[in-house]
Amino acid sequence: MALSSFSQIILPSPGMAALIRKARDELVSNAENGPSEYLSVHIRRGDRLGMTWKYHNTHVPTSLYVDAAVETWQRLNPASDSPLFYVASDSPEAVEDFLDQLPSNVRVTSLGWSSDEELRGIASPRSYVQEEFNTLGEEERIQLTKGMIVDFALLAGFWIKEDDPDARPYATVCGLRYSTALESLCRHVC
């Protein structure tokens, strides 16, 4: 219900819809047998720190994202031997670290690794810190916000029409700021 409400009430502008379409087309081109499902991963760095006792005031280790992504893929798609991950992050270094730790059979795409210059141009060039963002010029803030919206659309599968053959996320691995002693990583099956 919430997904359909969000997707029908909050709509991207035509320009944003074109960027989302371009990113989805590239994602589909990375799928082995045409449109398929993929696992999305969101790694937040910058001023977002962990709140659990284990990772209080530090970033959740990238290795936990890798372990959660691989385990989720194996659990939900045991017959697949070539997983496709979409990785969104405010930190190019976090994406590199994530890629370095993955098994070689995993295919990965992200805005920063796009073959399209316009998509690479909206990828976050550095970890997000709100105070720094507030000091940026308007055009840079607009570009970074566009990247966040495209990442959001691919992470969550928003704005895909029911009959659209696009690749869809079947699960998302992300770090959350829990105030309880729950594990820092969530595995949310969309």
Model-identified regions with their sequence ranges:
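Core catalytic architecture of nucleotide-activated donor-dependent transferases building glycoconjugates
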Residues: 1-132, 139
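A donor-sugar binding/catalytic signature common to diverse glycosyltransferases
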Residues: 146-190
